[in-house]
Amino acid sequence: MCHQQLVISWFSLVFLASPLMAIWELKKDVYVVELDWYPDAPGEMVVLTCDTPEEDGITWTLDQSGEVLGSGKTLTIQVKEFGDAGQYTCHKGGEALSHSLLLPHKKEDGIWSTDILKDQKEPKNETFLRCEAKNYSGRITCWWLSTISTDLTFSIISSRGSSNPQGVTCGAATLSAERVRGDNKEYEYSVECQEDSACPAAEERLPIEVMVDAIHKLKYENYTSSFFIRDIIKPDPPKNLQLKPLKNSRQVEVSWEYPDTWSTPHSYFSLTFCIQVQGKSKREKKDRIFTDKTSATVICRKNASFSVQAQDRYYSSSWNEWTSVPCS
């Protein structure tokens, strides 16, 4: 992820005395300090500059502690670990003049830390963000998992392409589900994003990038996912599933309809369907049939059930969940 390098002037609050960009502004008054994490690591030297034209009578404190760390318009600190992070504030005469929150971002053996989010391991290892789209309208849902529920914040940025990014607008992340896994709780967070100038019928040439900034207490981490919408398509299940017995026959005619959320016209945005009849025992063999039509004739015995699911006809993305109806 690219971040704009700090521009230093008289009113700047943080200055990094290093030729490398090891500190950058996440948002107003919040800065990420990138740290190589190993024993006896030197850390990063940071110079704080108070946002005031005053020169004298200025003192510095860290977080809520009243302990004075230094005096003068600038304060030089060495950020080596989380104990050196936090909110630094400059004061004069009992009044807070300006402040800056420093957040370490750990790198061990050349790899950025991924302690805040849980690896979902689907469709592959080190999958922290997962995204899906119900159609080609440019609306996307992304989600991630964590075992953390307190002192946790997220911010999301998304675009199509990185060299000349096109707009994708994301809402705020919300807690969407809570599960118990053995002795642990697992929290699912999600966000809705919309491509600003989506063209459903256009060929995708650049992937969509989704970037999540995660902060737990004073720890910062960054997670990214890159994809084409065609790769994350997962239609809603077919609707209005019906069975019609045929006279003098063991067979029934089953029919269904495209989901309301699927892109139109269906002659262009087509689905293919997988159908099956499942006996009362789940161990019974299931015969699956693939069809591009929205009806079929099958043998549907008593106590069995008929199921159907859908997938984009022209691109091998995800199948949706089965929707079922009893045979009798």
Swiss-Prot record:
Alphabetical keyword list: Cytokine, Disulfide bond, Glycoprotein, Immunoglobulin domain, Secreted, Signal
All copies of domain Fibronectin type-III, residue ranges: 237-328
InterPro entries assigned to the protein according to its UniProt record, in alphabetical order: FN3_dom, FN3_sf, Hematopoietin_rcpt_L_F3_CS, Ig-like_dom, Ig-like_dom_sf, Ig-like_fold, Ig_sub2, IL-12
Signal peptide limits: 1-22
Domain Ig-like C2-type: 29-106
A GO MF term: cytokine activity
Pfam families (alphabetical): IL12p40_C
Chief place where the protein resides: secreted
Disulfide bond sites: C50-C90
Annotated glycan sites: N125, N135, N222, N303
Gene3D superfamilies attached to this UniProt entry: Immunoglobulins (2.60.40.10)
Protein location: Secreted
One Gene Ontology cellular component annotation held by this UniProt entry: membrane
Protein function: Cytokine that can act as a growth factor for activated T and NK cells, enhance the lytic activity of NK/lymphokine-activated killer cells, and stimulate the production of IFN-gamma by resting PBMC.
Family indicated by similarity: Belongs to the IL-12B family.
Subunit annotation: Heterodimer with IL12A; disulfide-linked. The heterodimer is known as interleukin IL-12. Heterodimer with IL23A; disulfide-linked. The heterodimer is known as interleukin IL-23. Also secreted as a monomer. Interacts with NBR1; this interaction promotes IL-12 secretion.
Protein name per its UniProtKB record: Interleukin-12 subunit beta
Recorded name of the encoding gene: IL12B
